[in-house]
Amino acid sequence: IGMDDALEPYAIVIAPVLYMVKGDYDEKIRSYTRNGGIFVTTFFSGIVQENDLVTLGGYPGKLRDIMGIWVEEIDALPNGEENEFTYEGEKYPAKLLCDIIHTEGAKPLSEYEKDFYAGSPAVTVNSFGKGKAYYIGTASSEAFYQKLLTEICEDAGVAPVLKTPEMVE
């Protein structure tokens, strides 16, 4: 989906690492979500505006009200180091970057297990108008993304056209 394309035809819009939010793209996301869309983004989103200048007022910048969170700090993990979080009773790795999240209306779905930000949300969902906005504050495993995105798709009534066996893409 391009920045100029309509979001409304899609039940779910996933925009991982939406580092740059150009112009009024936040308004497009805001309207889409308010009117019942499901928006998913991740760590390192809303960091800069269209001229690559840092967004003032905290992250995820112009998406802050939609996501219902603000990011106080980003912990960059050295290569080979991991934190972890528990989601629905299963532990998953938190890798690369870990956003230290404070909720502003969003509901935490999981929390970090280690380091000085243990207990801080790792994944959140915010009800926004008729829609929902999910924020994934870290890089994780394929198993985690599979679990979360399957649940989001089921919630939105989105199903695959074909059922494929495991290990087939």
How should each PLM-predicted stretch be described?
Residues E8, P16-E169:
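A conserved amphipathic helix/loop scaffold
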Residues I1-A6:
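A short, well-structured beta->alpha microelement
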